[in-house]
Amino acid sequence: MQLSRRAEIGNPSSRNLSPRINEKVELLGQALEHARRAGMSSSLMEYGRQVARHLSANVQPDEKILSLDIRNLPLLAASYNRRYPDLDLRHMDSPARFFDALNDRSSDGAWRAVVRLADGEQHHVAADVRTRAGAAPTIIVMEGANFYTFVASYFKLRGDSFRQLGTQAKWAFIEVGAQKSAADCVMFGVQFALAAYRELPTFDAWHDNLHHHGTIAHEGDYSSDYMPRRHAGICANKPFSWGEVPPSDLLQALSLQQCN
């Protein structure tokens, strides 16, 4: 690692970090150096430096990092949408905005979103959506942490859905449970949205099941412990590997630092 990068993010080799963390710090350092040479905005550079310092110190993201994640999420979504034109990843900064998008029944469509779960709160979740011409949408929500932590917000979301979308919209909620810190939700949401895109045939089948008989399980499967999170495309530790997103893209490098 070059001296300039060490000054920005610290020297991970001097600490007892795992090879995986060392690799992430090195790759993020490369992305920062590339972004600096490209003249990227100072606010985005500061975001990258803050994330890199947390990684190098081997500490969990905090509320400051979460605020930076939220602030830069539209840029991050745009970056991924350029790379994957059919992804259609959106930032829904309020439940109301999410419902507005779900009310569009003009055409068939598939898109993903990282959604603020409740007004006035910072917690975000991932959603994979199918809209249908003249019919209600189906929505698969992926919670990175624990449902019970946010149970009041989920009850409100469902109640608001009935009022704004009617009773025909079909929802499925998957508790992935991979998030262990209090401030990783945005980046886990991004990764789950990307995993849903990568596993498109599986999610298409789940949406069809949800549309036709109200559950993502196959018809006739009444198992109470049916947990699609076991599918490798959802809960794999590395939904998108570093090799698939070059470290020269600072935004995409940042999206991988917390959940891989």
From Swiss-Prot:
Binding site for CoA: H123, K180, S181
EC category: transferase
Key words, A-Z: Acyltransferase, Plasmid, Transferase
Catalytic residues in the record: H123, E143, C185
Catalytic activity: L-threonyl-[protein] + acetyl-CoA = O-acetyl-L-threonyl-[protein] + CoA; L-seryl-[protein] + acetyl-CoA = O-acetyl-L-seryl-[protein] + CoA
EC number assigned by the record: 2.3.1.-
An example molecular function term from Gene Ontology annotations: acyltransferase activity
InterPro entries named in the record: YopJ-like
Functional note: Serine/threonine-protein acetyltransferase translocated into infected cells, which mediates acetylation of serine and threonine residues of host target proteins.
Family listed: Belongs to the acetyltransferase YopJ family.
Name of the featured protein: Serine/threonine-protein acetyltransferase NGR_a02610
Source organism (scientific name): Sinorhizobium fredii (strain NBRC 101917 / NGR234)
Taxonomic path: Bacteria, Pseudomonadati, Pseudomonadota, Alphaproteobacteria, Hyphomicrobiales
